[in-house]
Amino acid sequence: MQQEYYDLDLERAILSSCIMSEEAYASIAGDISPKDFSLKAHQDIFKAVIACSNNKEPISVSFLRKHKKIDEQILAEILATPSMIDLPAYVNELHEKSVKRQLLSFAHLLPTRINEDRAVSEIADEIGKEIFSITNRVNSRDIKDVDMVISELFEEFKKQKTLEN
């Protein structure tokens, strides 16, 4: 049985939730990246969502268009998709499919790498590093992006300063 390593309905539901609720996006922002989406148009829309968030702009259609050229048909499909309640489960499934796609893509390169005229230890070391790079995100999903941490820290400092006054 051929397994699918992408789910466009799943991707649309995640994007719909992020667009409909900034809180939903904030809850999963560090868990996925644009490359986790299999469809380039979905990657572009998620990049625009990230840009809106980073610029402290509303995550809305008008602002999304400002940051990235958006495929209007794909955006309409996303907006017609109901947002979901169990977003973390959907995000986890998206991430799992993404890692499997990356591993499958890497596996296709192995015969070429193995046939290179280099020492086996060098080839094995390189392959090990690449596999670690792909799978490391699976084990470090709770680690937030440094820009996000600094932004959150700065916001907390502002709140504390306001409370002191």
Q: Could you say what each language-model-derived stretch is?
A:
Residues 83-150:
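Interdomain "pre-motor" coupling segment immediately N-terminal to P-loop NTPase/helicase cores
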Residues 19, 95, 132-135, 154, ...:
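Signal for well-folded cores of large energy- and translation-related assemblies
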